[in-house]
């Protein structure tokens, strides 16, 4: 597997210790090319903020994480260019457009989206997503 789409449920695990954080870090050790929609920056920032509110991380750690994500993701994709395909997936799957942006990007790149989002895993077309817990290089 040479290209992966990473969603926010995986990216947050690079910065906050959660279940399967070790697996998420393995993606970074011998990384394939990592892709993400620009939307990931916002979702990651929101997830980091929630963890700050729970006193699990500091404001400094939030700043470090938001600064480092640009170096971690190899290819950023404009969310707007994925919107039409994401909307179609959203209607077909009866699922939030936010998540379908990641699926649309995976489809466009003929790649796989790695996620820890159980609901997304349950509704996504086969072969388009892989559970973080099941990901292997």
Where are the language model's segments positioned?
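Active-site neighborhoods of divalent-metal-dependent phosphate/nucleic-acid chemistry enzymes
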Residues: 71-116
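Short glycine/serine- and small hydrophobic-enriched flexible loop segments
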Residues: 46-53, 107-108
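Short, well-structured N-terminal submotif of metal-dependent ribonuclease cores
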Residues: 1-40, 51-64, 119, 136-137
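Acidic, PIN/NYN-like endoribonuclease modules and their adjacent C-terminal/linker elements
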Residues: 1-3, 95, 103-137
